[in-house]
């Protein structure tokens, strides 16, 4: 049985006139839409019921047949078929044109396909199509040549000279005749010959032409189909006309455009019937051509057709393009039923896997379930009365709702959803009021706060959806970030403050040194005010060891005892194998935010997520309870200004006076003076800050808040009670007058004014950053969306070599971090003892990584997606661990999207500023987000470094006019490089350099690295450089995410010599397809093709995908579709995006084809 939704691929091509007529249910002959009196569609008009179907269900136009019983009858009076009105969404019509017109996409696109086929310039073609010149179709026995362009005058002269011996024409008819005469096979052979013979521009043109010719040859499209005889009319429901209040009508722009075409077409028919003079007919044909152009792509040629208010009308192309177009608005993102949204409030009483759902919202969301249960329980007789009960909100309904909700998870989402933790599943708990309640620990993942944020709720309906929500999306199972595998559900703010307060130790507190027989006794003493939480006390601890109860007195505080009650005592902070330490508390230290992170991390590793979820809730309760009990508040007197501040300021002012004197005497330059002043004030600011921190009491609330990591940092305290310090002006240059005051003392007007630059720049920066970061994420998702783990092991023996990533001498990312959770290529052997630390094929754990670093190993060869041999997607062994679980990655994991989200999500944190290095004419070094974009788009960087193309010895020569570096290799080959003024040279005279080494400072062009040092070098370079940017901002991202993107950038090869294969010279081909073609050629004893790896930027790479649906929905929709139609492309539907567009399950996770045939059966208990 053929099912419409069950297909494996989708093909796009040019439509032949026959095909268009076959789609159509009738010809639209009149430009009328609806009758202004009856408001019924006009017959043969754009909304005609006879062509497109009835407007009302089961009712013909004249009203002779009404009701469903006449289904399928065609009315004998009005000719309308009695059927459902929704056929008006799918039935098409057509317009028979009186003269053929060209399709603007194929004539005007870049490159002009029609022009390439006919070997004519687009300008000449435009003249012919728009009736400004003649073209010779058949020169006969005359000296004219075929396809020669004749002006009006030349044509008349030739007519006089040669009479009827030759044929020339104008307009689309002439072009169609020329297209029909083309013999593609002959032309293809000719062009291949020409490519072998010619060089330069001629060869490039021939290659371009061959591409178009081959596209037509292989797709079975005929060139003359680029000229339209008949135009399809899309269904009326897709270009609706609706009545507004006040009796006016609003109509889709397409109707206006169609109307113009029909009017002009009818006028042309009439003129032809009347036998009007040629010049009038020609003008009308030109106008018809322009009307059709406007309908297909308004504004592509000449001035766009405008509607009322000078607004360009939206043509068929505009309906597909952009964010509001069909692809992105309706196919990739749809609004869904069973959803609601509301403001969020905090729910500290909830468990981590729960959320509070307002009662009225829950009732509406679960309405069908409630109705069914009411009927099943016999509370209502039928569904209709159940619906009434729910609508009247009877008391029984609430009890039923409670039961329905019990085992039914809901999804909560907060916009913007930057990574997959932006949607998580929770078990709903009914709450009064109209706000959603959110657990405080999941706020970090959502980046939510309670200052008025809203969130959306969605209900998973099917059994499978509920199972996925429960097992994969439940918040308790998502405690780790997919970016770097660190915990994301870490207590913040009050909870941190509470834990800090609870575990702090106070010397000389009340009851210090008292001894208690048990913890209970200590708690009693505390309740009676005998001791404080922070007093040092001794308590006898009891533990059962090997079945024997032992005890020992330990020194600690009551707070720490209480805190440890919540914490498992086997996390590994204390070495329990040591008999002296059996009784020690697991957490016997001051707990701030970082310590909490460590506790949770260890708990997940030791006990797994379920136990950790319980631990998190316990810490949350303790934190809230004791931050309330501690009652830590801020008063203005807590900002204690250090006494030494005045002294430091005075000293610095004296220092600056000296500097200014030196400058006035001409001993130092202005630049040096400026730098010294800045350095002096920076030092003063740091000294004051240090004095301030040392001056604050350990129990000062401000100090506690910042030390524990609950809120605020040193920098903010410095501004409150130290000195505000130096400010930057609008260009980012530091102003040399610092703000000496702090907020406690108050600023002078001048100081306040200086500080406004920075404040505003911050806001402007943030707004720009958000947009840029979102666009970067979108491009990353598009380039990597079809990377899915497709198999367990691809069996490759290749890998990449990893070392510490360094920037100068500073280690940015350590080796251990880079190898945890990866598979080694071979055995990793201890260099001295020769013992095997990790066998090949076993994942490197944290402990292994420690051993490797201890053994002094500096380089490790690991498997990587960069060298993975899976044809589509990657394999689990090359990818390594799934960071969100720490286990091996499952087949079906959508690692491409995870990679894109992991790189895109922190994008907003990266700074925008391109900052100036001091010194003479310092190059701008791009940093932050623009640098990441520059790398991923593989652009030529700003501040380009010159690199050596050969290995050899350096000689630097400086003359008055120029600096030059000459590199001489051992075999006498030399290369010389001119050094622009202001560049800093990195090498010195007589140095040995390798090919690809930098000669001057700056960023290297990745394309040069690929050319000189090869593929592995450019991969390493890109990964390292992106890591540098993120690590500078303190953002940790695992290498594998960047590797996934880089793999996609290097997927293609550029064919240099096609040999005897069917590949086209200069074409971009997938690496795997290329290897396959060559293997085929070699097997047949033919000459294989030669190609070079191509490095594409992410936008280019996303558009170069095999899937035209994915590319068209990304950018440049018309260009992608034009090309795809000519090539007759088939979309194999392997990626995620294409499947979303056509409405199938995505081929990842349980949607993979290998799981498709599994049937689900319900087990009744």
From Swiss-Prot:
GO terms for biological process: DNA-templated transcription. This is DNA-directed RNA polymerase subunit beta'. HAMAP family: RNApol_bact_RpoC. The lineage of its organism: Bacteria, Bacillati, Bacillota, Clostridia, Eubacteriales. One of its GO terms (cellular component) is DNA-directed RNA polymerase complex. NCBIfam families: PRK14906.1, rpoC_TIGR. It comes from the Bacteria. Keywords: DNA-directed RNA polymerase, Magnesium, Metal-binding, Nucleotidyltransferase, Transcription, Transferase, Zinc. It holds the Pfam family RNA_pol_Rpb1_1. InterPro entries: DNA-dir_RpoC_beta_prime (IPR045867), DNA-dir_RpoC_beta_prime_bact (IPR012754), RNA_pol_asu (IPR000722), RNA_pol_N (IPR006592), RNA_pol_Rpb1_1 (IPR007080), RNA_pol_Rpb1_3 (IPR007066), RNA_pol_Rpb1_3_sf (IPR042102), RNA_pol_Rpb1_4 (IPR007083). The RNAP catalytic core consists of 2 alpha, 1 beta, 1 beta' and 1 omega subunit. When a sigma factor is associated with the core the holoenzyme is formed, which can initiate transcription. The keyword Zinc applies. DNA-dependent RNA polymerase catalyzes the transcription of DNA into RNA using the four ribonucleoside triphosphates as substrates. One of its GO terms (molecular function) is magnesium ion binding. Belongs to the RNA polymerase beta' chain family. Mg(2+) binds at residues 449, 451, 453. Its EC number is 2.7.7.6. SMART domains: RPOLA_N (SM00663). It catalyses: RNA(n) + a ribonucleoside 5'-triphosphate = RNA(n+1) + diphosphate. Binds 1 Mg(2+) ion per subunit. Binds 2 Zn(2+) ions per subunit. Zn(2+) 2 binds at residues 794, 868, 875, 878. Its cofactor is Mg(2+); Zn(2+). Zn(2+) 1 binds at residues 60, 62, 75, 78.
């Amino acid at each position: 049985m053929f099912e419409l939704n069950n297909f494996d691929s989708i093909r796009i091509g040019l439509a032949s006139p026959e095909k268009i007529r076959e789609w159509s249910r009738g010809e639209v002959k009149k430009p009328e839409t609806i009758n202004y009196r009856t408001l019924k569609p006009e017959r043969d008009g754009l909304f005609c019921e006879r062509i497109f179907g009835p407007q009302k269900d089961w009712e013909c136009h004249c009203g002779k047949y009404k009701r469903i019983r006449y289904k399928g009858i065609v009315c004998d009076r009005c000719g309308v078929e009695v059927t459902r009105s929704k056929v008006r969404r799918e039935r098409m019509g057509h317009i028979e044109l009186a003269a053929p017109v060209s399709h603007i996409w194929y004539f005007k696109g870049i490159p002009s396909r029609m022009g390439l086929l006919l070997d004519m310039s687009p300008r000449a073609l435009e003249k012919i199509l728009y009736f400004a010149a003649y073209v010779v179709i058949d020169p006969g026995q005359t000296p004219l040549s075929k396809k020669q362009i004749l002006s009006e005058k030349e044509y008349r002269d030739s007519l006089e000279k040669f009479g009827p011996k030759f044929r020339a024409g104008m307009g689309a008819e002439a072009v169609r005749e020329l297209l029909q005469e083309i013999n593609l096979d002959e032309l293809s052979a000719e062009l291949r010959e020409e490519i072998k013979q010619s060089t330069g521009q001629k060869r490039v043109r021939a290659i371009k032409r061959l591409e178009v010719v081959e596209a037509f040859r292989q797709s079975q499209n005929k060139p003359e189909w680029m000229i339209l005889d008949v135009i399809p009319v899309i269904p009326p429901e897709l270009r609706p006309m609706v009545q507004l209040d006040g009796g006016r009508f609003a109509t889709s722009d397409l109707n206006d455009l169609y109307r113009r075409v029909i009017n002009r077409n009818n006028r042309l028919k009439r003129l032809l019937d009347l036998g009007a003079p040629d010049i009038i007919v020609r003008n009308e044909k030109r106008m018809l051509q322009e009307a059709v152009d406007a309908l297909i792509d308004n504004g592509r040629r000449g001035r766009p057709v405008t509607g009322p208010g000078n607004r360009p009308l939206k043509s068929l192309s505009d309906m597909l393009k952009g964010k509001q177009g069909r692809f992105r608005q309706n196919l990739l993102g749809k609004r869904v039923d069973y959803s609601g949204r509301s403001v969020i409030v905090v729910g500290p009483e909830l468990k981590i896997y729960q959320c509070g759902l307002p009662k009225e919202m829950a009732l509406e969301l679960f309405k069908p379930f409630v109705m069914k249960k009411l009927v099943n329980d016999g509370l209502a007789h039928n569904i209709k009365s159940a619906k009434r009960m729910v609508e009247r909100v009877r008391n029984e309904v609430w009890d039923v709702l409670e039961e329905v909700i019990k085992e039914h998870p809901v999804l909560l989402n907060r916009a913007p959803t930057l990574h997959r933790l932006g949607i998580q599943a929770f078990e709903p708990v009914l709450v009064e009021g109209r706000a959603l309640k959110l657990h405080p620990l999941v706020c970090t993942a959502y980046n939510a706060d309670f200052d008025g944020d809203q969130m959306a709720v969605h209900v998973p309906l099917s059994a499978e959806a509920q199972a996925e929500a429960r097992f994969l999306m439940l918040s308790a199972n998502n405690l780790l970030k997919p970016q770097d595998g660190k915990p994301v559900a870490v207590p913040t703010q009050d909870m941190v403050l509470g834990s800090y307060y609870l575990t702090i130790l106070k010397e000389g507190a009340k009851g210090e040194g008292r001894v208690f027989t048990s913890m209970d006794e200590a708690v009693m003493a505390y309740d009676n005010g005998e001791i404080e939480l922070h007093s040092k006390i001794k308590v006898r601890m009891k533990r059962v060891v090997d079945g024997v109860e032992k005890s020992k007195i330990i020194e600690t505080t009551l707070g720490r005892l209480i805190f440890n009650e919540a914490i498992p005592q086997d996390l590994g902070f204390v070495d329990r194998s040591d008999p002296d330490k059996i009784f020690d508390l697991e957490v016997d230290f001051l707990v701030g935010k970082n310590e909490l992170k460590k506790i949770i991390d260890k708990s997940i590793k030791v006990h797994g997520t379920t136990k950790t979820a319980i631990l998190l809730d316990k810490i949350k309760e303790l934190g809230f309870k004791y931050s309330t009990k501690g009652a830590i508040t801020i008063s203005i007197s807590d900002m204690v200004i250090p006494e030494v501040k005045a002294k430091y300021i005075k000293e610095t002012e004296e220092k600056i006076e000296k500097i200014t004197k030196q400058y006035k005497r001409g001993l130092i330059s202005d630049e040096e003076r400026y730098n010294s002043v800045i350095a002096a004030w920076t030092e003063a600011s740091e000294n004051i800050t240090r004095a301030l921190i040392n001056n604050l009491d350990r129990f000062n609330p401000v100090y506690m808040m910042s030390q524990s990591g609950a809120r605020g940092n040193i920098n903010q305290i410095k501004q409150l009670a130290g000195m505000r310090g130096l400010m930057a002006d609008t260009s980012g240059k530091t102003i040399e007058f610092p703000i000496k005051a702090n907020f406690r003392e108050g600023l002078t007007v001048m100081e306040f004014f200086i500080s406004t630059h920075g404040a505003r720049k911050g806001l402007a920066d943030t707004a720009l950053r958000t947009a840029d970061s979102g666009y970067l994420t979108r491009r990353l998702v598009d380039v990597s969306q079809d990377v899915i783990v497709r198999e367990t092991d691809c069996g490759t023996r290749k890998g990449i070599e990893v070392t510490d990533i360094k920037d100068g001498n500073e280690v940015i990312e350590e080796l251990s971090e880079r190898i945890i959770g990866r598979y080694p290529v071979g055995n990793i052997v201890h260099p001295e003892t020769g013992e095997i630390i990790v066998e090949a094929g076993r994942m490197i754990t944290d402990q292994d990584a420690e051993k490797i670093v201890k053994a002094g190993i500096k380089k490790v060869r690991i498997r990587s997606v960069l060298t993975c041999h899976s044809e589509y997607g990657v394999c689990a062994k090359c990818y390594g661990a799934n960071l969100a679980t720490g286990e091996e990655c499952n087949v079906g994991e959508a690692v491409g999207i995870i990679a894109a989200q992991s790189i895109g999500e922190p994008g907003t944190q990266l700074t925008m500023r391109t900052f100036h290095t001091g010194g003479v004419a310092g190059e701008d070094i791009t940093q932050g987000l623009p640098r990441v974009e520059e790398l991923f788009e593989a652009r030529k960087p700003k501040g380009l470094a010159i690199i050596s193309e050969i290995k050899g010895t350096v000689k630097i020569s400086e003359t008055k006019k120029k600096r030059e570096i000459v590199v001489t290799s051992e075999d006498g080959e030399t290369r010389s490089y001119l050094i622009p003024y202001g560049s800093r040279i990195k090498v010195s005279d007589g140095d040995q350099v390798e090919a690809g080494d930098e000669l001057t400072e700056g960023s290297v062009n990745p394309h040069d690295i690929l050319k000189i040092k090869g593929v592995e070098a450019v991969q390493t370079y890109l990964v390292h450089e992106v890591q540098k940017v993120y690590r500078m901002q303190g953002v940790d991202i695992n290498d594998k995410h960047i590797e996934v993107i880089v793999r996609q950038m290097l997927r293609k090869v550029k064919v240099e010599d096609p040999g005897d294969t069917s590949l086209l010279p200069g074409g971009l081909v997938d690496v795997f397809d290329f290897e396959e073609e060559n293997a085929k050629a070699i097997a047949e004893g033919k000459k294989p093709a030669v190609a070079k790896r191509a490095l594409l930027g992410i936008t280019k790479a996303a558009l170069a995908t095999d899937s035209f649906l994915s590319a068209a929905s990304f950018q440049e929709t018309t260009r992608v579709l034009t090309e795809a139609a000519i090539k007759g492309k088939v979309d194999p539907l392997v990626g995620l995006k294409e499947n979303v567009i056509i409405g199938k399950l995505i081929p990842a996770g349980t949607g993979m084809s290998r799981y498709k045939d599994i049937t689900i059966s319900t087990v009744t208990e």
